[in-house]
Amino acid sequence: MKTPLFCQEEKSISTAFPFLLLNSDAISAGKGEVGVASSPDIFSQRVNASKYIFLPTSSAVAINYMPFTHRAVRDVFLGGITFYKKRVRDAFGANFSYFSIGDVNLTQEIGQQTYILGTFKPTEFSLEGSYSLQLSQSFAMGVSTRFLSSQLSVPSQGKSVARALAFDIAGYFYSQEHFISSLLYRYTFGFQLSNVGTKVKYDDLGRSFYLPTQLKLGAGFLLQTDSYNEWELSIEAQKYLVPTPNEQGVPDKDIIEALVSSFSDAPNGFREEFHEINWAVGLEYKYNQSFFLRSGFFYQHKNKGDRKFLSIGAGFTFFNNWQMDVAYPFSFSTYKNPFHTFKLNLIYRFGQ
């Protein structure tokens, strides 16, 4: 009988287009990056498009921004623009996200001299759309498609642009109103299978990378104490659905096989599979739907990325149709993550 070798070193999972896992939405980021089952907002496009069905306004547009914080680099950022349109029983959403990695100097050494040949600006972007349909009074589902493009290598070095297609499927349950004495409450559930798609090669000779496919499950509880004050608590679990690296590297599997086997392929068995689950909890206070305070906590195991942070956030509406949100995380990781920085949103709601 073979005995599992639990002493093997656990390895973190690397994927193509890692910027898809960077959260530049200040609403979600302020709540520990929960989103799959939290209350709907315009940035539901990325975390659970089916939530658009339950928004009170028919359409809105928003921009979001997150900079890279390092004294030596000032032009690295992730930003995006999002739009949605809701009808009676369905909704459409669209998003464009752009990740700039700044200017890279191309140099050549001749003798003891280093010459600058020019500059190169690595970038990645995603263009996506979604469709959501209300299936019952309290439940909706949505699908999203996503075109991805990455230019990380120097154009003269063979293949310079990597492209991929991906899709999401999501569902959201938003309960009817219930009462405990004079207190009104709702409960929510959500799921999302995200970034299912083609494998990616960044150059002609390199290996293929999986997209950052994830399964997210979440639940939420909304409590309204009176007509002005509302509280929301959300919890979420996230699991990579790509092969876990072993001693030989990353197994080469087709997409369906990778999805199915990702629940049981970790070299250290169930313990390592459990370590691959990220956990998040978020709390939000709303006053008259015009002022918001948020906080949350995100946990990722130290062997699988070591992202641990406490986040805070706030938002407010102005001129009736506008809303601004900001969030900031306080990291507890053993290393400094340059993307643990502030996030900023600006939202405009039509016809409010």
Residue ranges and their predicted role:
Residues 8-352:
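Subset of outer-membrane beta-barrel
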